[in-house]
Amino acid sequence: MPHIDIKCFPRELDEQQKAALAADITDVIIRHLNSKDSSISISLQQIQPESWQAIWDAEIAPQMEALIKKPGYSM
């Protein structure tokens, strides 16, 4: 059951853009992980820039070895 949790700075995405993003990500997961559409869930959380350090400290830095795409920045 893949669950994708996207955190990003705020973006002005309308519902159609969010649906297109979800569809594209779903297609990639189906292709690479051989998942069923019904098993995939995707979360989009918009985080204010001044709060990003907390995301880095709790979710990015401790998981650096497990990341399959590492960030090109550090904090």
From Swiss-Prot:
<dbReference type="GO" id="GO:0016862">
    <property type="term" value="F:intramolecular oxidoreductase activity, interconverting keto- and enol-groups"/>
</dbReference>
<protein>
    <recommendedName>
        <fullName>Tautomerase PptA</fullName>
        <ecNumber>5.3.2.-</ecNumber>
    </recommendedName>
</protein>
<keyword id="KW-0413">Isomerase</keyword>
<dbReference type="Pfam" id="PF01361">
    <property type="entry name" value="Tautomerase"/>
</dbReference>
<dbReference type="GO" id="GO:0005737">
    <property type="term" value="C:cytoplasm"/>
</dbReference>
<dbReference type="InterPro" id="IPR004370">
    <property type="entry name" value="4-OT-like_dom"/>
</dbReference>
<feature type="active site" description="Proton acceptor; via imino nitrogen">
    <location>
        <position position="2"/>
    </location>
</feature>
<dbReference type="InterPro" id="IPR014347">
    <property type="entry name" value="Tautomerase/MIF_sf"/>
</dbReference>
<dbReference type="InterPro" id="IPR017284">
    <property type="entry name" value="Tautomerase_PptA"/>
</dbReference>
<keyword id="KW-0963">Cytoplasm</keyword>
<comment type="similarity">
    <text>Belongs to the 4-oxalocrotonate tautomerase family. PptA subfamily.</text>
</comment>
<comment type="subunit">
    <text>Homodimer.</text>
</comment>
